[in-house]
A protein has these predicted regions:
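Function-determining sites in protein domains
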Residues: 22-170
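Bacterial N-terminal signal peptides
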Residues: 6-16
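Membrane-interface motif at the C-terminal end of an N-terminal transmembrane signal
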Residues: 17-21
Length: 170
């Protein structure tokens, strides 16, 4: 009887858990969109993407000090100046190249560190994000320093795209 009850409860739990929580695929693509970009930037090189996995950091079973695209070790920081350019960064995973996590990346050209905002309860992408990883109130709705590995990849791509877009005939 106990065994049957345990099997039934486990079956119900599996049926009730959202698919993204069960299908923790690797990041297969990251897209960067922004008002100043004509077309989204896509990063799909598996060697690059190996560093930027959704299911690492707070709210997961790994306590990596740098993961996703955030330097978690520095903790939350003040909201950055509104003058910084902002970009929506979407993480896509298998199966079916689906978007499973979205954050905001803000930076200004130069050596000033960039920032990452993890959407909170009142933000558009919060629902999607918590179906993948519920990072908790210590993280959601807060700004963090961008991880230097992310900055080395994203900044040159964004700056190159912005320059290319600015010289295109309108």
């Amino acid at each position: 009887m106990r065994m049957a009850l345990a099997v039934l409860l486990n079956s119900l739990l599996i049926l009730c858990v959202p698919t993204p929580l069960l299908a923790k695929g690797k990041t297969v693509k990251v897209t960067i969109k922004g008002a100043v970009l004509k077309t989204p930037i896509e990063i799909s090189d598996p060697k690059i993407l190996a560093n930027f996995q959704v299911w690492t950091g707070p709210g997961t079973s790994t306590a990596d000090r740098q993961s996703l695209m955030i330097d978690w070790s520095q903790g939350p920081v003040r909201k950055p100046p509104e003058s910084l350019s902002r970009y929506r960064v979407s993480f896509h995973t298998d199966p079916n190249d689906q978007i499973v996590y979205v954050v905001c990346y803000a930076f200004s050209p130069g050596s000033v560190p960039g920032y990452v905002y993890v959407p909170g309860e009142v933000d558009e992408w919060h629902g999607l994000n918590v179906r993948s990883v519920a990072r908790g109130v210590e993280v959601e709705g807060k700004w963090f320093r961008a991880w230097s590995a992310w900055e080395r990849v994203a900044r040159p791509l964004i700056e190159k795209a912005e320059v290319a877009d600015s010289i295109q005939p309108r």
